[in-house]
Amino acid sequence: TTTVQYNPSEQYQPYPEQQEPFVQQQPFVQQQQQPFVQQQQMFLQPLLQQQLNPCKQFLVQQCSPVAVVPFLRSQILRQAICQVARQQCCRQLAQIPEQLRCPAIHSVVQAIILQQQQQQQFFQPQLQQQVFQPQLQQVFNQPQQQAQFEGMRAFALQALPAMCDVYVPPQCPVATAPLGGF
């Protein structure tokens, strides 16, 4: 006679577990419609912005007519800062692959505008916001900010490549990208 010994390590399941039907999330075809370059930009934008920090510095430090700085520095100090920022900016811009230079410059301008917006909001007296309707104010500010952004972007796309003697493709794929913060 054979005796069946109960082994506690073996687990007996009276019924096989019901497997949930596999739920397809999104068909892969939809994802492919987005151009590869755009996908690259989404991942690389923070990286590019960091890499082009000297260019941001250059544009903000009143090294160019487009920059607006609330306080004045001595001319010599500013020239020295601008020269260093310019050299670093050009070095970094040259290292960025050609097809990514335009989105890189775009993201730098975006960062400058957002920074300026935050500064304006910070310095804006609270009393003024209570007197005027905030919704009304936003409606009037938006086209102005969009125009400011477009102006600075157009300037940066001309000035930086010319100054650094690097090629930036004339077709900028991110020209219609909405600006964050609106």
Curated annotation (Swiss-Prot):
Keywords for this protein: Allergen, Repeat, Seed storage protein, Storage protein, Vacuole
MF GO annotations: nutrient reservoir activity
One GO CC term on file: vacuole
Annotated Sequence repeat ranges: 21-26, 27-34, 35-41
Main location: other
Signal peptide positions (record): none
Domain of life: Eukaryota
Region spans: 3 X 7 AA tandem repeats of P-F-V-Q-Q-Q-Q: 21-41
Compartmental location: Vacuole, Aleurone grain
Pfam families xref list: Gliadin
Function of the protein: Seed storage protein. Serves as a source of nitrogen, carbon, and sulfur for the young developing seedling.
Record's subunit section: Monomer.
Record-stated family: Belongs to the gliadin/glutenin family.
Protein name, per record: Avenin-E
